[in-house]
UniProtKB/Swiss-Prot annotation:
Disulfide bonds: none
Active site: C81 (nucleophile), H196, E198
InterPro entries listed in its UniProt record: Class_I_gatase-like, GATASE, Imidazole-glycPsynth_HisH
Keywords of the record: Amino-acid biosynthesis, Cytoplasm, Glutamine amidotransferase, Histidine biosynthesis, Hydrolase, Lyase
Protein name: Imidazole glycerol phosphate synthase subunit HisH
Gene Ontology MF term list: glutaminase activity; imidazoleglycerol-phosphate synthase activity; lyase activity
The organism of origin for this protein: Bifidobacterium longum (strain NCC 2705)
Listed GO CC annotations: cytoplasm
């Protein structure tokens, strides 16, 4: 049976993700144990709250090391919501910069919109040949966030002894207010979504099925 760990570091709607994966036949564990998180077929990194607080919580339980070690070994990782944001190099909240995991080049900033947070269902500009969004390219997904990454830059992952240069980088986008932001990111074993697939009905279930098929 396919196994997955939903990483439990104190931030995120973990129970809903555990249920969503279990309902798709995945043997799912909620834990922050390093060995279990490293050895599972898939790792989900959720996240809700402030970028800096999530990074602090992640580091307290060696979550950053788990992510680096899995990506280095080619083992799939899925970041969701702030779990996507922390994969970027930096986050800017309330005028303060915080360092992220750094596997995606760029920074996370406040959305430029009259109403924040961006909350509700929205469509996505799907990247060509997207694996995650295959079959649900024109569907709507559920978002709830105030910050996002507005661009993707080249990331120097060599400092982590990680080389993803042989893998295509696929970026899907969403627009809200005056911002066009990263809605989904795929690069080798690293996948991430700004929206919540576990709260996105049938389309979200199909996305999770697509990810599970890569494990």
């Amino acid at each position: 049976m396919t196994t997955a760990v939903v990483f439990d570091y104190g931030f995120g709607n973990v129970r809903s993700m555990v249920r969503a994966l279990a309902n798709l036949g995945v043997d799912t564990t909620l834990t922050s144990d390093y060995r279990q998180s490293l050895e599972a077929d898939g790792l989900v990194v959720p996240g809700v709250g402030a970028f800096a607080a999530c990074m602090e919580g992640l580091k307290k339980v060696d979550g950053d090391r788990v992510i680096y070690d899995r990506i280095r070994a080619g083992r799939p990782v899925l970041g969701v919501c702030v779990g996507e944001q922390i994969m970027f190099e930096h986050g800017l909240e309330h005028g303060a910069h915080a360092a992220g995991i750094g596997l995606i080049g760029g920074s996370v900033n406040l959305l430029d919109a009259d109403v924040v947070p961006h909350m509700g269902w929205d469509t996505i500009e799907t990247a060509p040949d997207s694996v995650l969004l295959n079959g649900v390219e024109n569907e709507r997904f559920y978002f709830v966030h105030s910050y996002a990454a507005m661009e993707v830059k080249p990331a120097d992952t060599s400092r982590f002894d990680i080389d993803l240069s042989d893998s295509p980088e696929r970026v899907s986008w969403c627009s809200y207010g005056r911002s066009r932001f990263v809605a989904a990111y795929e690069h080798g074993p690293l996948s991430a979504t700004q929206f919540h697939p576990e709260k996105s009905g049938d389309a979200g279930s199909q996305l999770l099925k697509n990810w599970i098929a890569t494990l």
